[in-house]
């Protein structure tokens, strides 16, 4: 059984590796952690850590798909890098559909869910590059679409 300090060291090393934005597979992360001296690291443990910390796959500066952590591991904000990930916002009667860059949907959905009912968002479901957002009783799809476009400073 790991002592808390070893677990904390593992989490620190894991986060530091993802900040490098160079790991395209879970196997590469396992290898890097093993090279740093951590024992009993396997793909399933890395997968659980990626989920726990909200890691997503996105393109790095070299346009490679890599694992990275959302900014500050907190609730993301609509800063310039995020707004560039939103490609299209459309709607039908009950749902607003958002298209994003590949791998960005979960990050954008997390931001939208953090805004919640005050912005007319009841909840969202995200895939790899598509988000379905459902609205509260007091909102219209047109209002919600406008709020989302305003959040990402888009005119789609």
Swiss-Prot record:
GO CC terms of this entry: cytoplasm
Pathway: Amino-acid biosynthesis; L-arginine biosynthesis [regulation]
Keywords: Amino-acid biosynthesis, Arginine biosynthesis, Cytoplasm, DNA-binding, Repressor, Transcription, Transcription regulation
Keyword Iron-sulfur included in the entry's annotation: no
Gene3D superfamilies: 3.30.1360.40, Winged helix-like DNA-binding domain superfamily/Winged helix DNA-binding domain
Cytoplasm found in the keyword field: yes
Protein's name according to its UniProt entry: Arginine repressor
Biological source species: Photorhabdus laumondii subsp. laumondii (strain DSM 15139 / CIP 105565 / TT01)
HAMAP family: Arg_repressor
Family from the record: Belongs to the ArgR family.
PANTHER family: ARGININE REPRESSOR
One GO term (biological process): regulation of arginine biosynthetic process
A Pfam family that the UniProt record links to this protein: Arg_repressor
Gene symbol of the encoding locus: argR
Function text: Regulates arginine biosynthesis genes.
Main location: cytoplasm
Record's subcellular location: Cytoplasm
């Amino acid at each position: 059984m790991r002592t808390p300090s070893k677990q904390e060291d593992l989490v620190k090393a894991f986060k530091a590796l993802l900040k490098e934005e160079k790991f395209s597979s879970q196997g590469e992360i396992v290898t890097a952690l093993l090279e740093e001296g951590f024992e009993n690291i396997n793909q399933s443990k890395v997968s659980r850590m990626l989920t726990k910390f909200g890691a997503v796959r996105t393109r790095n500066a070299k346009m490679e798909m890599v694992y990275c952590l959302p900014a500050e591991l907190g609730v993301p904000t609509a800063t310039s890098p995020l707004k560039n990930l939103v490609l299209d916002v459309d709607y039908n009667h009950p749902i607003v559909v958002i298209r994003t860059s590949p791998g960005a949907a979960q990050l954008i959905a997390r931001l939208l869910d953090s805004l919640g009912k005050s912005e007319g968002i009841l909840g969202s479901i995200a895939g790899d590059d598509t988000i379905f957002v459902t609205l509260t009783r007091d909102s219209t799809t047109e209002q919600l679409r406008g709020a989302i476009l305003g959040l990402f400073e888009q005119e789609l």
